[in-house]
């Protein structure tokens, strides 16, 4: 029997507001534990919540960017549960009247475009954070009350690979809107995954398992891959899948049972009595709509249709707003479009990955990168020299030409000097000369390599090719 995988994702996004959802406390990451709190966050008796209008605007902006319908009337509800980092013993969320419904995003997997539906987007407050140490636990309520939006996909995802693509696209769109940093490492983006299997052709969904502790997109994919295999083996062996919440163990790559899954009835939702419903008229919706910036799909189309970039380049460059903005600024400084794209996808990304830094944390600027690319364009600097210059440019900033000169990397373009390298290579590699004369094209490449090696990569490659052909034709 063959099974179809059905996946739905619940993504929590922390909104980048100055204050919390229902209190004036700061909502900033990284403060001393329990320093960003007040009587509302600590649930003192008699205190009343006040809705953060900026958070509502940003929830609407995100929903619009995800092609959602904005509710005319939306309300808050109490989700009741007890946990030490939830001092009220309930969370203010939205149950049956979310702010946004019926959206979608388009993803690309293996060269094909697929539309993934989004059921709803609702607002809620975050809980605090518990840290467990041995026999005791520490509670930090700085995060308590931070504004969140939860984005719930339709069960349209059919593979862990599609889930990864959905998360990448969702993160990209939200980042472009400016409503969140969407940094998983800081907790401003978190994901729970629901997965079930059903026989191909069956309409009824199988029993789902919810996966938690998915701290990176890669872990989401790995957790789903493991769970897909676990459920298939269980079903093929005649077993049944229970409705469970499971935790992904990063060290083993397996999912581990946490508890039997609760349903919404277990939370005893009821309308929040201390907050009146939101009435969102067309004028309010239009004001928010006017604030939506250019989104990744629009930029991607512009890069292909107006700048002439391949679709792959456009996709990679628009994955993050940071990279896309940097690209646009670099070409505004006069750098060649395709060379800039190649450097950002190649040398720049390699440097960032190797040093585990973000682009904006380096000393690289669009201006100094454009300066280096223009030196490559006009033949002053070879690509090989550029690779030696770039790490210092990214680490210390400055001017690429000056770095090249300070490190004795100036490209050799003097013909007399280059002829010495050329003739030395020909004298030392007579067999390659014969191979060239016999029509073996690889011989030319080998000889160029020998010359570049002898000149320590400083020979002007265009001039080397010209002089080498000239000298070969004489022999």
From Swiss-Prot:
EC number(s) recorded for this UniProt protein: 6.3.5.-
Catalytic activity annotation: L-glutamyl-tRNA(Gln) + L-glutamine + ATP + H2O = L-glutaminyl-tRNA(Gln) + L-glutamate + ADP + phosphate + H(+); L-aspartyl-tRNA(Asn) + L-glutamine + ATP + H2O = L-asparaginyl-tRNA(Asn) + L-glutamate + ADP + phosphate + 2 H(+)
Matches recorded under InterPro entries: Asn/Gln-tRNA_amidoTrfase_suB/E, Asn/Gln-tRNA_Trfase_suB/E_cat, Asn/Gln_amidotransferase, Asn/Gln_tRNA_amidoTrase-B-like, GatB, GatB_C_1, GatB_Yqey_C_2, Gln-tRNA_amidoTrfase_suB_CS
Tagged with keyword ATP-binding: yes
Coiled coil (UniProt feature): none
Gene Ontology biological process terms, A to Z: glutaminyl-tRNAGln biosynthesis via transamidation; translation
Keywords: ATP-binding, Ligase, Nucleotide-binding, Protein biosynthesis
Pfam families: GatB_N, GatB_Yqey
SMART domains: GatB_Yqey
Signal sequence range: none
SUPFAM superfamilies membership: GatB/YqeY motif (SSF89095), Glutamine synthetase/guanido kinase (SSF55931)
KW Nucleotide-binding (keyword) present: yes
Gene Ontology terms, MF aspect: asparaginyl-tRNA synthase (glutamine-hydrolyzing) activity; ATP binding; glutaminyl-tRNA synthase (glutamine-hydrolyzing) activity
Source species, domain of life: Bacteria
Function as written in the Swiss-Prot or TrEMBL entry: Allows the formation of correctly charged Asn-tRNA(Asn) or Gln-tRNA(Gln) through the transamidation of misacylated Asp-tRNA(Asn) or Glu-tRNA(Gln) in organisms which lack either or both of asparaginyl-tRNA or glutaminyl-tRNA synthetases. The reaction takes place in the presence of glutamine and ATP through an activated phospho-Asp-tRNA(Asn) or phospho-Glu-tRNA(Gln).
Entries under PANTHER family matching the protein: GLUTAMYL-TRNA GLN AMIDOTRANSFERASE SUBUNIT B MITOCHONDRIAL AND PROKARYOTIC PET112-RELATED, GLUTAMYL-TRNA(GLN) AMIDOTRANSFERASE SUBUNIT B, MITOCHONDRIAL
Subunit-structure text: Heterotrimer of A, B and C subunits.
Protein name (Swiss-Prot/TrEMBL): Aspartyl/glutamyl-tRNA(Asn/Gln) amidotransferase subunit B
Annotated organism of origin: Staphylococcus aureus (strain Mu50 / ATCC 700699)
């Amino acid at each position: 029997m063959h099974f179809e995988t059905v996946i739905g994702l619940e993504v929590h996004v922390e909104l980048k507001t100055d204050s919390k959802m229902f209190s004036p406390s700061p909502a900033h990451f990284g403060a001393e534990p329990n320093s960003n709190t007040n009587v509302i966050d600590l649930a003192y008796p008699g205190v009343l919540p006040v809705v953060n209008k900026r958070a509502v605007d940003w929830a609407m902006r995100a929903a619009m960017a995800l092609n959602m319908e904005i509710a005319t009337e939306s309300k808050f509800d109490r989700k009741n549960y007890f946990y030490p980092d939830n001092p009220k013993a309930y969370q203010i969320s939205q149950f049956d009247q979310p702010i946004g419904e019926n959206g979608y995003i388009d993803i690309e997997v293996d060269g094909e475009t697929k539309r993934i539906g989004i059921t709803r987007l609702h607002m809620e407050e975050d809980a605090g954070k518990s840290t467990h140490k041995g026999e005791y636990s520490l509670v930090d309520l700085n995060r308590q009350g931070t504004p969140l939006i939860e984005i719930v996909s339709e069960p349209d995802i059919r593979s862990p690979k599609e889930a990864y693509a959905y998360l990448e696209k969702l993160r990209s769109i939200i980042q472009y809107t400016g409503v969140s940093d969407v940094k998983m490492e800081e907790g401003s983006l978190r994901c729970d995954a629901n997965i079930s299997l059903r026989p191909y052709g069956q309409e009824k969904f199988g029993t789902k398992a919810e996966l938690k502790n998915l701290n990176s997109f890669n872990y989401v994919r790995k957790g789903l891959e493991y769970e897909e295999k676990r459920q298939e083996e269980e079903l093929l062996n005649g077993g049944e899948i229970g409705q469970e919440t499971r935790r992904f163990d990063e060290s083993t790559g397996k999912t581990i049972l946490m508890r039997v899954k609760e349903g919404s009835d277990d939370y005893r939702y009821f309308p929040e009595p201390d907050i009146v419903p939101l009435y969102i008229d067309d004028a309010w919706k239009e004001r928010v709509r006017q604030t939506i910036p250019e989104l990744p799909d629009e930029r991607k189309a512009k890069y292909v249709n107006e700048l002439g970039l391949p679709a792959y380049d456009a996709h990679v460059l628009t994955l993050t707003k940071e990279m896309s903005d940097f690209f646009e600024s670099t070409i505004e400084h006069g750098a060649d479009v395709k060379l800039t794209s190649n450097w950002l996808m190649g040398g720049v990304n390699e440097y960032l990955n190797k040093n585990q830094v973000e682009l904006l944390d380096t000393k690289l600027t669009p201006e100094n990168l454009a300066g280096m690319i223009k030196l490559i364009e006009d033949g002053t600097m070879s690509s090989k020299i550029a690779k030696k210059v770039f790490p210092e440019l990214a680490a210390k900033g400055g001017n690429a030409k000056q770095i090249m000169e300070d490190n004795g990397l100036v490209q050799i373009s003097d013909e007399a000097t280059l002829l010495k390298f050329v003739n030395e290579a020909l004298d030392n590699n007579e067999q390659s000369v014969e191979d060239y004369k016999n029509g073996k094209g690889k011989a030319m490449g080998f000889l160029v390599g020998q010359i570049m090696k002898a000149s320590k990569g400083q020979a002007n490659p265009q001039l080397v090719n010209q002089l080498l052909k000239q000298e070969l034709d004489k022999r």
